[in-house]
Amino acid sequence: MADDLEQQSQGWLSSWLPTWRPTSMSQLKNVEARILQCLQNKFLARYVSLPNQNKIWTVTVSPEQNDRTPLVMVHGFGGGVGLWILNMDSLSARRTLHTFDLLGFGRSSRPAFPRDPEGAEDEFVTSIETWRETMGIPSMILLGHSLGGFLATSYSIKYPDRVKHLILVDPWGFPLRPTNPSEIRAPPAWVKAVASVLGRSNPLAVLRVAGPWGPGLVQRFRPDFKRKFADFFEDDTISEYIYHCNAQNPSGETAFKAMMESFGWARRPMLERIHLIRKDVPITMIYGSDTWIDTSTGKKVKMQRPDSYVRDMEIKGASHHVYADQPHIFNAVVEEICDSVD
C-alpha cells in the first residue's frame, strides 16, 4: 500500500534477505494494527510528511473536548507507538495525545544519520521540531522514555517556548560513565547480552543476523514484555511487534550507537547540559524502583536547577519500563502533572 515504507530492492542480496529475515514493513503494520485495535478512544493513525521527504508515523488520540495543551509521548530505544497501548486511553481522556515513531524507528522513515554524536542527536531533535511545525502544535507537555527522555531534554534546550512541562521517564544518557566499576548498577541480563555482542556492530544486530531465529530471541531475552502486556495480549503480539520494529534497516539504531558510550551511557551526557534548559520550564523525573538506570540523576538535576521546578519520584514495583510495569499508577501520575499545566 502507499502508506507502507517498504525498503527498496538493492539487488540479489535484498531479495534474498526477506527469506532469511522474516520481517517487512507490512508485517510491522499488521502487528501494530492488532495492538491499536485495543484502543477504546477514537484515534487517527497516519504518516506526517516532513519537508525533507521523511515521514513520521503518528498516532493521535483525542477526546471530544480537546482545548487543553496536548501531551506528546516519545518512545525509547527499539520501541514504537504500540508500546504506549496501556497508557493512551487513560492519558487522552481530557486532552489530545500524540505519539509517533522516532525517525529511524518503527514505521517512520529510516534515513542515513550523521555518524557523529552531536550530528545524530541534532537530526533526531530537528525531526521532532519539524514534525511539531507540520502538525501545527503551538506548545506541548513533552514526555520521553529512556532514549526518548534524552531527546526530549535536548529538544527542550533548543525549543523551550514549545514545552509547557518536561516529563522524563527513566531517561537514558544523563550521568557521566563512572570510572569506578563498583559505582555501576548491575544491568539486566538482556543489557549484558547486548553489550557482549556490541563491538563494531549495532546494538540489536543479532536480531537481524539470527534470521528466522530472530523472533525467538526476543521471546528468550525479553519474556518480561509478554507479562507486562498480558492484560491485553495472551499471545506473542508484543514480542512480534518488538521484533519487527528492530529487524528492519537499523537507521535509528545506528544513530543511537553513534550517541552512546557502551550501552548505558551517552557520549554527550545530558547532566552536563541540562542547566541550559530555560529556568521557567518545569521538569518531572519518574523512575521505576527496580530500574537499572541511575536514579540519583533526579537529585543531581535538582542541584543544577535550584531556581527551577524539578520533581523526581519513584514508582514502586516498576523497572525501566515504568509505563508498562505499573500503568495505572503511571497514568495517574502523568494525568496529575498534565492537570497542573491546564
Swiss-Prot record:
One of its GO terms (molecular function) is carboxylic ester hydrolase activity. GO terms for biological process: lipid catabolic process; lipid homeostasis; N-acylphosphatidylethanolamine metabolic process; phosphatidic acid biosynthetic process; phosphatidylethanolamine acyl-chain remodeling. It catalyses: N-hexadecanoyl-1,2-di-(9Z-octadecenoyl)-sn-glycero-3-phosphoethanolamine + H2O = N-hexadecanoyl-1-(9Z-octadecenoyl)-sn-glycero-3-phosphoethanolamine + (9Z)-octadecenoate + H(+); an N-acyl-1,2-diacyl-sn-glycero-3-phosphoethanolamine + H2O = N,1-diacyl-sn-glycero-3-phosphoethanolamine + a fatty acid + H(+); N-hexadecanoyl-1-(9Z-octadecenoyl)-sn-glycero-3-phosphoethanolamine + H2O = N-hexadecanoyl-sn-glycero-3-phosphoethanolamine + (9Z)-octadecenoate + H(+); N-octadecanoyl-1-(9Z-octadecenoyl)-sn-glycero-3-phosphoethanolamine + H2O = N-octadecanoyl-sn-glycero-3-phospho-ethanolamine + (9Z)-octadecenoate + H(+). Its EC number is 3.1.1.-. Keywords: Hydrolase, Lipid degradation, Lipid metabolism. It is an enzyme of class 3 (hydrolase). Residues 70-201 form the AB hydrolase-1 domain. InterPro entries: AB_hydrolase_1, AB_hydrolase_fold. One of its GO terms (cellular component) is mitochondrion. PANTHER family: (LYSO)-N-ACYLPHOSPHATIDYLETHANOLAMINE LIPASE (PTHR42886:SF21), RE40534P-RELATED (PTHR42886). Lysophospholipase selective for N-acyl phosphatidylethanolamine (NAPE). Contributes to the biosynthesis of N-acyl ethanolamines, including the endocannabinoid anandamide by hydrolyzing the sn-1 and sn-2 acyl chains from N-acyl phosphatidylethanolamine (NAPE) generating glycerophospho-N-acyl ethanolamine (GP-NAE), an intermediate for N-acyl ethanolamine biosynthesis. Hydrolyzes substrates bearing saturated, monounsaturated, polyunsaturated N-acyl chains. Belongs to the peptidase S33 family. ABHD4/ABHD5 subfamily. This is (Lyso)-N-acylphosphatidylethanolamine lipase. It comes from Homo sapiens.
